[in-house]
Amino acid sequence: MIVVPVKEGENIERALKRFKRKFEKTGAVRELRARQAFEKPSVAKRKKMQKAIYVKQLQVAEE
Protein backbone atom coordinates (compact mmCIF):
# COMPACT_ATOMS: atom_id res chain seq x y z
CA MET A 1 0.00 0.00 0.00
CA ILE A 2 1.30 3.45 -0.93
CA VAL A 3 1.30 6.04 1.83
CA VAL A 4 1.85 9.71 1.06
CA PRO A 5 1.75 11.87 4.19
CA VAL A 6 0.43 15.37 3.51
CA LYS A 7 2.74 17.94 5.06
CA GLU A 8 1.55 20.95 7.04
CA GLY A 9 0.28 23.62 4.64
CA GLU A 10 1.00 21.50 1.57
CA ASN A 11 -1.25 21.90 -1.43
CA ILE A 12 -3.42 18.82 -2.06
CA GLU A 13 -2.51 18.95 -5.75
CA ARG A 14 1.17 18.58 -4.89
CA ALA A 15 0.46 15.64 -2.58
CA LEU A 16 -1.61 14.01 -5.33
CA LYS A 17 1.25 14.51 -7.77
CA ARG A 18 3.65 12.79 -5.33
CA PHE A 19 1.18 9.92 -4.96
CA LYS A 20 0.89 9.49 -8.73
CA ARG A 21 4.69 9.48 -9.08
CA LYS A 22 5.09 6.83 -6.37
CA PHE A 23 2.30 4.73 -7.90
CA GLU A 24 3.94 4.92 -11.33
CA LYS A 25 7.30 3.82 -9.90
CA THR A 26 5.78 0.69 -8.38
CA GLY A 27 4.84 -0.57 -11.86
CA ALA A 28 1.43 -1.84 -10.74
CA VAL A 29 -0.38 -0.75 -13.90
CA ARG A 30 2.27 -2.28 -16.16
CA GLU A 31 2.08 -5.56 -14.26
CA LEU A 32 -1.72 -5.66 -14.44
CA ARG A 33 -1.67 -5.10 -18.18
CA ALA A 34 0.97 -7.79 -18.63
CA ARG A 35 -1.06 -10.29 -16.62
CA GLN A 36 -4.30 -9.78 -18.57
CA ALA A 37 -3.22 -12.32 -21.15
CA PHE A 38 -0.69 -15.13 -20.86
CA GLU A 39 2.53 -14.59 -22.74
CA LYS A 40 4.81 -17.49 -23.54
CA PRO A 41 8.27 -17.19 -21.99
CA SER A 42 9.87 -17.34 -25.44
CA VAL A 43 7.73 -14.41 -26.63
CA ALA A 44 8.55 -12.42 -23.49
CA LYS A 45 12.26 -13.09 -24.00
CA ARG A 46 12.04 -12.02 -27.65
CA LYS A 47 10.27 -8.78 -26.70
CA LYS A 48 12.87 -8.07 -24.04
CA MET A 49 15.71 -8.60 -26.53
CA GLN A 50 14.05 -6.39 -29.15
CA LYS A 51 13.56 -3.63 -26.60
CA ALA A 52 17.21 -3.87 -25.54
CA ILE A 53 18.34 -3.59 -29.17
CA TYR A 54 16.05 -0.60 -29.73
CA VAL A 55 17.32 1.21 -26.63
CA LYS A 56 20.92 0.48 -27.63
CA GLN A 57 20.30 1.96 -31.10
CA LEU A 58 18.81 5.10 -29.53
CA GLN A 59 21.86 5.49 -27.30
CA VAL A 60 24.25 5.06 -30.23
CA ALA A 61 22.29 7.56 -32.35
CA GLU A 62 22.33 10.05 -29.47
CA GLU A 63 26.14 10.00 -29.26
UniProtKB/Swiss-Prot annotation:
GO terms for biological process: translation. InterPro entries: Ribosomal_bS21 (IPR001911), Ribosomal_bS21_CS (IPR018278), Ribosomal_bS21_sf (IPR038380). PROSITE patterns: RIBOSOMAL_S21 (PS01181). Signal peptide: none annotated. One of its GO terms (cellular component) is ribosome. HAMAP family: Ribosomal_bS21. Belongs to the bacterial ribosomal protein bS21 family. This is Small ribosomal subunit protein bS21. It comes from Porphyromonas gingivalis (strain ATCC BAA-308 / W83).
